[in-house]
């Protein structure tokens, strides 16, 4: 007699607790949720607002408040300073001294017509501070020197082996003239890989005779040159003039034209 045919028994099984039921788009009303199977292991508490690791700077939480709109970001003044003054500088720190370059804006005076004119050009203030320890500088003993626009131009024209010297008397034309002497020398280093900035100050009013020098590398001097080229129009007030030009307010040039101007406009 042949053996009996095997019997197959099919039993309905409960879906695993970690799986969600399949969603059928055509019949959303028939969607049911299978309650998870009770487990003896206690689930860890989930925080209401997850916090990303500090390493993930690109984490975005839709519940978090939106970031600021850029008032305090790169290229713009901080909050509340849109109409205020912004100070900036370029500083170089070496073993024996530190040197800071600080631009100063031109002085504008109002006219009766409501316009403005430049009464005094801006300048770049050089501040030398001697070192008192490793990476420590005494800014209370600093010596300063103001570079005018034409002095900046002289510095920009220096060749690899050229040097220049500027002399200042802060009291020139006054009764104390000659009592304070400041001499700034800029000369190449012996190896030709940089510059020396040397400031000598003699002040007989307070019995000071001091000389502070600092070596400047080629890279640092390149930054100085690039910055000076950029800042010159701003120190002269020309950038402010260009920003004030408005096509809708332009009027015909009414000053009598010279022969050369007439030839130029032909």
UniProtKB/Swiss-Prot annotation:
InterPro entries on file: ssDNA-bd_transcriptional_reg, Whirly
Annotated source species: Zea mays (Maize)
Residue stretch of the organelle transit peptide: 1-37
Subcellular location: Plastid, Chloroplast stroma; Nucleus
Residue numbers spanned by region Required for ssDNA binding: 94-99
Family: Belongs to the Whirly family.
Coiled coil region boundaries: none
Cleavable signal peptide: none
Quaternary organization: Homotetramer.
Protein name (Swiss-Prot/TrEMBL): Single-stranded DNA-binding protein WHY1, chloroplastic
Chain ranges for the short sequence motif Nuclear localization signal as given in the UniProt record: 172-185
GO BP: defense response; DNA repair; negative regulation of DNA recombination; regulation of DNA-templated transcription
GO molecular function: DNA binding; RNA binding; single-stranded DNA binding
Tree of life domain: Eukaryota
Membrane-spanning segments: none
One Pfam short name: Whirly
S-S bonds: none
Keyword hit for DNA-binding: yes
Effect of loss of the gene: Albino seedlings lacking plastid ribosomes.
């Amino acid at each position: 007699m042949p053996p009996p045919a095997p019997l197959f028994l099919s039993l309905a099984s409960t879906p695993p607790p970690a799986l969600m039921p399949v969603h059928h788009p055509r019949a959303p009303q028939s969607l049911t949720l299978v309650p998870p199977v009770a487990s003896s292991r206690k689930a860890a508490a989930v925080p209401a607002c997850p916090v990303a690791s500090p390493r993930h700077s690109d984490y975005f939480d839709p519940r978090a408040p939106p970031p600021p709109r850029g008032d305090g970001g790169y290229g713009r003044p901080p909050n509340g300073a849109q109409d205020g003054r912004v100070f900036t500088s370029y500083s170089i720190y070496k073993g024996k001294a530190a040197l800071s370059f600080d631009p100063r804006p031109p002085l504008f005076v109002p006219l009766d017509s409501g316009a403005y004119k430049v009464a005094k050009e801006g300048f770049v203030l050089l501040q030398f501070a001697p070192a008192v320890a490793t990476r420590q500088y005494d800014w209370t003993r600093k010596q300063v020197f103001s570079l005018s626009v034409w002095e900046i131009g002289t510095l920009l024209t220096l060749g690899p082996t050229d040097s220049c010297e500027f002399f200042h008397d802060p009291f020139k034309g006054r009764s104390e003239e000659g009592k304070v002497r400041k001499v700034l020398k800029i000369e190449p280093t012996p190896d030709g890989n940089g510059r020396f900035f040397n400031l000598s100050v003699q002040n007989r009013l307070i019995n000071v005779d001091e000389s502070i020098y600092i070596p400047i590398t080629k890279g640092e001097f390149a930054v100085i040159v690039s910055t000076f080229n950029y800042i010159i129009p701003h120190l002269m007030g020309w950038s402010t003039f260009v920003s004030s030009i408005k096509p809708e307010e332009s009027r015909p040039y009414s000053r009598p034209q010279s022969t050369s101007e007439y030839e130029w406009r032909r």
